[in-house]
Amino acid sequence: LAHDIKTPLTSVIGYLSLLDEAPDMPPKQKAKYVGITLEKAYRLEQLINEFFEITRFNLQTIFLNKGKINLLFMLQQMADEFYPMLTPQGKQVSVNVPNGLTLWGDADKLARVFNNILKNAIAYSYENGVIDIAAEQQDKNIVITFTNHGNPIPQEKLETIFEKFFRLDTSRSTNTGGAGLGLAIAKEIVNAHGGNIFVQSNTEKTVFTVVLPQK
């Protein structure tokens, strides 16, 4: 969970640093950065509260507050929030989602899922690489994929990657920390929505796939 908390904290520090280093920043851009910083600070508070919730309850019993979700808006906004983490190593996020693609789900909890997956994709991708996020409708489901190029996950680790306290660091070198709850939490949230999450990794490409019912 420390890994999850570090993500919004890094964004807050990154955007505040940009604001501090550029006092003459255009007002519109400054307002955007301040807004993102405040949002991530609130997100940090939510994660801390969720930590205590997780210690008391089984995730499968958590109530889902479902509503209509605009996937393009959610995923593009998430990519923008990771900007401070991407630029130091020349990484980018490409979002390819059709306009108007929606699904019915808990926006806050699914944002947690997508944040966890993107965070790992960024951490384990090569410098100057591009992380591709795509979504499409397949029958009655929405399929979202996160693709990054970097050191692969060993095949023997793929079956346990969504277990609590599993650490990707044991198989792939990175500077990230954490207790290894992020992907386990993601799986529980996806399952609660009646969906599925899985990963494929070979050579130098890793793809996380989330399948969710549209309604």
Model-derived segments and their meaning:
Residues 39-44:
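Short alpha-helical segment of the dimerization/phosphotransfer core of two-component systems
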Residues 65-68, 87, 92-102:
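Conserved catalytic submotifs in the C-terminal HATPase_c
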Residues 121-122:
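Short helix-loop "hinge" at the ATP-lid/N-box region of the Bergerat-fold HATPase_c
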Residues 128-140:
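Short beta-strand/loop element within the Bergerat-fold HATPase_c
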Residues 153-167:
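Short conserved segment of the HATPase_c
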Residues 177, 182, 186:
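Short alpha-helical Gxxx[C/S/T] motif in the catalytic ATP-binding
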Residues 194-195:
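Conserved glycine-rich
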